[in-house]
Amino acid sequence: MNKTAIALLALLASSASLAATPWQKITQPVPGSAQSIGSFSNGCIVGADTLPIQSEHYQVMRTDLRRYFGHPDLVMFIQRLSSQVSNLGMGTVLIGDMGMPAGGRFNGGHASHQTGLDVDIFLQLPKTRWTSAQLLRPQALDLVSRDGKHVVPTLWKPEIFSLIKLAAQDKDVTRIFVNPAIKQQLCLDAGTDRDWLRKVRPWFQHRAHMHVRLRCPADSLECEDQPLPPPGDGCGAELQSWFEPPKPGTTKPEKKTPPPLPPSCQALLDEHVI
């Protein structure tokens, strides 16, 4: 196993060992009609659905962490996408983190995934279903070269291109985050059908999975959507800027103090956490 794969596994494992946040003390969805509240990186959810663990089209990883909750729209998206993938004979979709029962802030590994509208999906589609042991300790497949400038040709498969494209074409999806090298390969492979590329955004890490984000549901009145991605396919200067060396004097941004919770989320926390 190479160093990058080991690091990815360590990151998965480390998030479970950090101190719990108050949101992790809520072990069941909060009753009520489904409402995503706040922003993706500062919010919560009422009336979350549980993604069924058993499915012929997908498998859920790390069920011991209990991060398989989300807005009903997210559950339906996962079922819709995995059914499409299965019908095309592409393999089994591997589902990573969604959100916690009431959403909210994680103890590590994610800044977002707080409103029940985000899901991580591995960029591999096994033809043979994984065992319980494999699902509990998943082996991330790093698709990006060590220098970060391109995908590994022997690991990049047409099925992965199709998986990302199918997700991006879904009506409820607003963004998909992938590594810049993966976005670059999508740009090369896309041909003339390029409208969907607008939703695929380059971001740090994301070498072995895609992070799919849905738009705010119309009836979630306190949900804060992001602005739409810039027009175009995103394959030009913006993408190339990710491969340029840091400018002299560039320093890492200081870690910010988390902003106050939306009032509805604070009230939910006060009511359900002793």
UniProtKB/Swiss-Prot annotation:
It is found in: Periplasm. Keywords: Disulfide bond, Hydrolase, Metal-binding, Metalloprotease, Periplasm, Protease, Signal, Zinc. One of its GO terms (biological process) is peptidoglycan metabolic process. Residues 227-274 are annotated as: Disordered. Its EC number is 3.4.24.-. Dimer. This is Penicillin-insensitive murein endopeptidase. The lineage of its organism: Bacteria, Pseudomonadati, Pseudomonadota, Gammaproteobacteria, Enterobacterales.
